[in-house]
């Protein structure tokens, strides 16, 4: 019998689903129970193909635009948030709609409105084209929000009024990258209005902090998540910056190239906020097939946050 090589697997805690993702998935499930299939969902409810396929099997139909939905079936808006024009159009068509926007994203929308009503010029730190950024910018008239993606953008930004500025941020960014951009803005515009509470969400921060703890001793870090998942992509970047020798983004155990493990004795494993736990366990089992695995849980925070369902689905 061949002896399996040893592998120490450092498992991040917390990892995977956050409260906003849990709530969004539950909204689709409860809508299907209440109204039956099909229920339409505008954009992937969360950025994870496995989650989407499971909900499709239950009767959810995913579309990119509201015009693809019939008037007489319920539609759900994804956790990332939508421009104001979307619920306005649904209302005009007398559609039943449920907004699954994460409450932490909605908080950023409220901040944007507050700054706009105070006649401040608004800077959004985020990634162009991400659904959350499109949704946040779409809360206000076109041209009201300037998007800044990098420190260089912050240094080059020319506001209309240096003394009347505010910034908000996409919730799923790298904590460190955002800090650098904020510092660049504040050095140029000391009076810029800041969020009441940091916009980077608790789950994004917690998952990045766990990776920072185990990355320095890891020869390889695997992050389970979709390439369209901003927070998952950031976890790979955080792992490399924190000292991991290598880091890869995988959708599931099927994506693993086992040549990555040549000479490896220490693996770090985590999952983005939209990746279900069964994918994590699948990677652990795949490792056990090839290695004598010792799992060490690296716990850096307790998460007790939960969000209520919209009133139309509660109770």
From Swiss-Prot:
Its cofactor is [4Fe-4S] cluster. Keywords: 4Fe-4S, Iron, Iron-sulfur, Isoprene biosynthesis, Metal-binding, Oxidoreductase. (2E)-4-hydroxy-3-methylbut-2-enyl diphosphate binds at residues 47, 80, 130, 171, 229-231, 274. CDD domains: lytB_ispH (cd13944). Isopentenyl diphosphate binds at residues 47, 80, 130, 229-231, 274. Dimethylallyl diphosphate binds at residues 47, 80, 130, 229-231, 274. Its EC number is 1.17.7.4. [4Fe-4S] cluster binds at residues 18, 102, 201. Pathway: Isoprenoid biosynthesis; dimethylallyl diphosphate biosynthesis; dimethylallyl diphosphate from (2E)-4-hydroxy-3-methylbutenyl diphosphate: step 1/1; Isoprenoid biosynthesis; isopentenyl diphosphate biosynthesis via DXP pathway; isopentenyl diphosphate from 1-deoxy-D-xylulose 5-phosphate: step 6/6. The active site is at 132 (proton donor). GO terms for biological process: dimethylallyl diphosphate biosynthetic process; isopentenyl diphosphate biosynthetic process, methylerythritol 4-phosphate pathway; terpenoid biosynthetic process. It is an enzyme of class 1 (oxidoreductase). Binds 1 [4Fe-4S] cluster per subunit. One of its GO terms (molecular function) is 4 iron, 4 sulfur cluster binding. It catalyses: isopentenyl diphosphate + 2 oxidized [2Fe-2S]-[ferredoxin] + H2O = (2E)-4-hydroxy-3-methylbut-2-enyl diphosphate + 2 reduced [2Fe-2S]-[ferredoxin] + 2 H(+); dimethylallyl diphosphate + 2 oxidized [2Fe-2S]-[ferredoxin] + H2O = (2E)-4-hydroxy-3-methylbut-2-enyl diphosphate + 2 reduced [2Fe-2S]-[ferredoxin] + 2 H(+). The keyword Ligase does not apply. The keyword Metal-binding applies. Catalyzes the conversion of 1-hydroxy-2-methyl-2-(E)-butenyl 4-diphosphate (HMBPP) into a mixture of isopentenyl diphosphate (IPP) and dimethylallyl diphosphate (DMAPP). Acts in the terminal step of the DOXP/MEP pathway for isoprenoid precursor biosynthesis. Belongs to the IspH family. HAMAP family: IspH. NCBIfam families: ispH_lytB (TIGR00216), PRK01045.1-2 (NF002188), PRK01045.1-4 (NF002190). This is 4-hydroxy-3-methylbut-2-enyl diphosphate reductase. It comes from Hyphomonas neptunium (strain ATCC 15444).
């Amino acid at each position: 019998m061949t002896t399996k090589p040893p592998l120490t697997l450092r498992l991040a805690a917390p990892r995977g689903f956050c409260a906003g993702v849990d709530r969004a998935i539950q909204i689709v499930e409860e809508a299907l129970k209440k109204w039956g299939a099909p229920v339409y969902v505008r954009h992937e409810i969360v950025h994870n193909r496995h989650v989407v396929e499971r909900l499709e099997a239950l009767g959810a139909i995913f579309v990119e635009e509201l015009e693809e939905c019939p008037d007489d079936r319920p539609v759900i808006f994804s956790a990332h948030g939508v421009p104001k024009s979307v619920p306005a159009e649904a209302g005009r068509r007398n559609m039943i709609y449920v907004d699954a926007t994460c409450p932490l994203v909605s908080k950023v929308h409220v901040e944007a409105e507050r700054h706009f009503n105070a006649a401040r010029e608004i800077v959004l730190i985020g990634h162009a084209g991400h659904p959350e950024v499109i949704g946040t910018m779409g809360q206000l008239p076109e041209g009201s929000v300037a998007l800044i993606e990098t420190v260089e953008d912050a240094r080059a930004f020319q506001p209309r009024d240096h003394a009347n500025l505010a910034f908000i941020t996409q919730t799923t960014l790298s904590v460190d990258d955002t800090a650098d951009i904020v510092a660049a803005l504040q050095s140029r515009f000391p009076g810029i209005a800041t969020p009441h509470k940091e916009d980077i969400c608790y789950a994004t921060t917690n998952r990045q902090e766990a990776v920072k703890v185990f990355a320095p001793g890891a020869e390889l870090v695997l992050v389970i998540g979709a390439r369209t998942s901003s927070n998952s992509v950031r976890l790979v970047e955080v792992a490399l910056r924190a000292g991991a020798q290598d880091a890869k983004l995988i959708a599931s155990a099927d994506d693993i190239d086992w040549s990555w493990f040549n000479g490896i004795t220490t693996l770090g494993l985590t999952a983005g906020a939209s990746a279900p736990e069964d994918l994590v366990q699948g990677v652990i089992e795949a490792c056990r097939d090839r290695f004598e695995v010792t799992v060490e849980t690296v716990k850096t925070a307790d998460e007790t946050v939960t969000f209520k369902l919209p009133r139309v689905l509660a109770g």
